[in-house]
C-alpha cells in the first residue's frame, strides 16, 4: 500500500432488507484519502453520504468490502482498537458543535487528549497550542454560551485536532452558520490543512465553497462519482 494513503475503502457495500428485498445504501464504493488531501463529498439527502462517514469512522460495519486505515483493516481490529483509532488518528466535526456547556473553551478542547491518558498539564498545553491555530486564544476561559456560532464551531475544530489526527471527517460543518461564519470555517480548514498537513474529508452542500475543493466527489444512489473537471 502506498505510504501516502491514510484511508482506503474497497468495494464498500452497505445493505438492509425490506420484505426480503435487498436495499443498497452504498454500492461498491472505492475511495482513497492521501496525506494532505482535502476531499469534498456532495450529494442529495438520502444518497448515502452519512452512511459512508459512519463506516469510515468505524461507527458501523459494512455488509461487504473493506476499509483500511494506514494499511490495517478495520475488520481485523477489536472494538477497543477501533475506539482508540477514533480518538488518536481520526478527528470528527459535526453539524452541531456538541461542546459541553459547563466546560470552558480550553476544557472542551482537552477532552480527547485526556481520554487518551495524557496528563492534565500536557492536555492543557496541547489544547492551548491548537487554540492559537484556530485564532481563539483570547477566548480560552469563555464558555460556549459566551461564544458566537462560528466561534463554537472553531472550538469544535480545535477539539478534533488536539490529538494531531491523520484525518478529520467533517459532516456539514457550516450548515448552521451564516455566510460570513461559513467562510471563516472553510478558510480555517484550508489554512489548517496547509499548516498541519492534516487530511480532511468533508461532506457539504455549500456550493459557494465546494467549488474550491481540490478533490470533489458526488454521491448518487449509493455510488461515488468524480465531479471535478
UniProtKB/Swiss-Prot annotation:
One of its GO terms (biological process) is lipoprotein localization to outer membrane. Its EC number is 7.6.2.-. It is found in: Cell inner membrane. InterPro entries: AAA+_ATPase, ABC_transporter-like_ATP-bd, ABC_transporter-like_CS, ABC_transpr_LolD-like, LolD_lipo_ATP-bd, MacB-like_ATP-bd, P-loop_NTPase. It is a peripheral membrane protein. Its main location: membrane. ATP binds at residues 43-50. Keywords: ATP-binding, Cell inner membrane, Cell membrane, Membrane, Nucleotide-binding, Translocase, Transport. GO terms for molecular function: ATP binding; ATP hydrolysis activity; transmembrane transporter activity. GO terms for cellular component: plasma membrane. Part of the ABC transporter complex LolCDE involved in the translocation of mature outer membrane-directed lipoproteins, from the inner membrane to the periplasmic chaperone, LolA. Responsible for the formation of the LolA-lipoprotein complex in an ATP-dependent manner. The complex is composed of two ATP-binding proteins (LolD) and two transmembrane proteins (LolC and LolE). NCBIfam families: LolD_lipo_ex. Belongs to the ABC transporter superfamily. Lipoprotein translocase (TC 3.A.1.125) family. This is Lipoprotein-releasing system ATP-binding protein LolD. It comes from Buchnera aphidicola subsp. Schizaphis graminum (strain Sg).
Amino acid at each position: 500500500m502506498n505510504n501516502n494513503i491514510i484511508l482506503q475503502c474497497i468495494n464498500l457495500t452497505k445493505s438492509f432488507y425490506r420484505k426480503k428485498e435487498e436495499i443498497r445504501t452504498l454500492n461498491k464504493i472505492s475511495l482513497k484519502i492521501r496525506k494532505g488531501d482535502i476531499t469534498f463529498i456532495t450529494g442529495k439527502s438520502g444518497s448515502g453520504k452519512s452512511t459512508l462517514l459512519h463506516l469510515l469512522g468505524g461507527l458501523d460495519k459494512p455488509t461487504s468490502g473493506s476499509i483500511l486505515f494506514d494499511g490495517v483493516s478495520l475488520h481485523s481490529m477489536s472494538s477497543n482498537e477501533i475506539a482508540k483509532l477514533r480518538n488518536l488518528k481520526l478527528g470528527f466535526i459535526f453539524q452541531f458543535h456538541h461542546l459541553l456547556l459547563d466546560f470552558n473553551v480550553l476544557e472542551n478542547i482537552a477532552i480527547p487528549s485526556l481520554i487518551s491518558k495524557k496528563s492534565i498539564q500536557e492536555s492543557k498545553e496541547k489544547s492551548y497550542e491548537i487554540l492559537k491555530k484556530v485564532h481563539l486564544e483570547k477566548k480560552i476561559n469563555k464558555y460556549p454560551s459566551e461564544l458566537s456560532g462560528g466561534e463554537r464551531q472553531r472550538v469544535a475544530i480545535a477539539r478534533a485536532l488536539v490529538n494531531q489526527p491523520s484525518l478529520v471527517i467533517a459532516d456539514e460543518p457550516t450548515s448552521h452558520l451564516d455566510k460570513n461564519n461559513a467562510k471563516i470555517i472553510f478558510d480555517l480548514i484550508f489554512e489548517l490543512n496547509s499548516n498541519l498537513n492534516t487530511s480532511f474529508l468533508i461532506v457539504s452542500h455549500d456550493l459557494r465553497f465546494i467549488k474550491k475543493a481540490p478533490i470533489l466527489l458526488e454521491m448518487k444512489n449509493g455510488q461515488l462519482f468524480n465531479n471535478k473537471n
